[in-house]
């Protein structure tokens, strides 16, 4: 009997202090560019980034900001709207974005700028292909890039 009462008293604080989880469903109704999300990352500022089949989406907890490929304005942007993967750089304020057939984009969210890395058949140091499937941070500060090649 003592063991039963002791077990109840030991478990009771855990049961009483439990907080209910709140789950917020995010979709195109809330501003997401597409319901087909292929990758999610959280940056150092707490924003959530969603890679979709129709652009890059930043969610600040209240609203979405969508980044699309800009072909007509000349504005700096991502190189493609069909995305495969995201990685928040463990050191710098950079979000690495792997695309389908459009290389890698490095988005610096500290100064709102993009750098693009593409395959160049004349440069053996470039990406082997523009189809990027996964980006992984190595412990030595380098990146592992997975491709369809």
Model-predicted regions and their roles:
Residues 1-149:
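Carboxylate-rich, polar loop motifs that coordinate divalent cations or form catalytic acidic clusters
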